[in-house]
Amino acid sequence: MTVPDTYKKKCSSFSAKIILGCLLACFFLLLNGSITCKAETKTYTNKSTGYQVIVEDDANLLTDEEETALGKEMAPITTYGSVAFKSIDYNPYYSTEDYIRSYYRDTFGSTSATVFLVDMDERNIWIHSNGTIYETITKSYANTITDNVYKYASDGDYYTCAFTAFDQIN
């Protein structure tokens, strides 16, 4: 029995489409698996000082409204330096302190700034400051602030935790 040529052409065209479709589906599945989502970074720059407010909630601990309100609470600090709230759910470093020092260096270099970090991977909160702000927010005072607000983080109230920390930094 012989198969007509038109049938062969239809089958080979159909097979090619199926193979192409499967390859595209596999490509997009692989691509989708390699993409990591990062929370939207909210920033504000003080026009008179050039210092910034940065809110990076990578662990998605805050609502959009809480991020906005937190940024407003942080804004007065830009008189003395930049200020950041950072939350993470994965810490590739040995400790929370190592992570925050690296983040500070990458984000602010050696300029005056303070960072409040919520490290969900290590279950830790940390404040790191440098420059002019360090004259007020010393390591000792940063430890006092984190001691004061730790109870809010323990209760899962990360907004109040961060808001109160920045209120004490102000």
PLM feature segments, named:
Residues 2-170:
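A structural boundary signal for the start of the first folded domain, especially the loop/turn
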